[in-house]
Amino acid sequence: MKIQSLLPVLLLCAASANAADNIRIEYMPAETTHDKLAEQSIQSSDLNPIFVRLSQAYFPFRKPLTLIYGGEDGPMYDPDTHTIHIPYTFYLESLNYFSNNQYEDRYGKSPKTGALDTLLHTLLHEAGHAYIVDQSIPVLGKEEDAVDNFATILLIDYLDDGADMAISAADMFAFESDDRPDYYDFGEYIDEHSFDLQRYFSTLCLVYGSDPEQYKSLLDEVEKDYLRDRKDFCQYNYENIRTNWQHYLQHNDPKNSEKPSSSPNAMTN
């Protein structure tokens, strides 16, 4: 049995207002026309209900989490207030990247779809930080990489079409990388985040590893000398990361659990 993609209106309202007393969702006043567009696009999508249902099913918080849209900070998680901040500008910038890169012409997905897919991946990334704090999960290595994996594994394993949504998020990393100069400042080499292009390939690696047959051409950008080795690694890496995160997720076996339906694409345009 699969959870239906478009939830009843009453349930949508309840999820946004109460989030089952586990996640509180707030919208700061949208001050510009563009901010109002972003607010409307987010509110009219299935994104927040999907996020809430995933949390309820797989990573429930002991302490209620607050998600705030708007403002200037973020995307970020503030551990002092147990709050995720997502500015409207993040959605708008993502929308511009997907539009400017002719996403619909190249891949058959609208810029809005790409931007909302990216936003869901980002919400799950920030929720990963929150879950680590909430559950006192030890992290060996870069926490930013760990929560990138958290977000991607949740999409792949627990959402219909989630792998396709993860690919959209990966493409956003590639667009941001293309928009950078050809060099990095020294300080960026000790930044908490991996480089955008690394995040792009790491995300694609997990998607490929989850189903090598379906995504057999996904890593074709990799040079032929490395391709077979990388494909083997990605299959191992997906299983390893998935197994590690399942120690901390509820309903550990995704193959025998319900999937909340996908996509923030079942959205009002």
Model-derived regions, located:
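Active-site metal-coordination segments of metallo-dependent hydrolases
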Residues: 31-40, 134-150
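Post-HExxH zinc-binding segment in Zn-dependent metallohydrolases
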Residues: 142-180
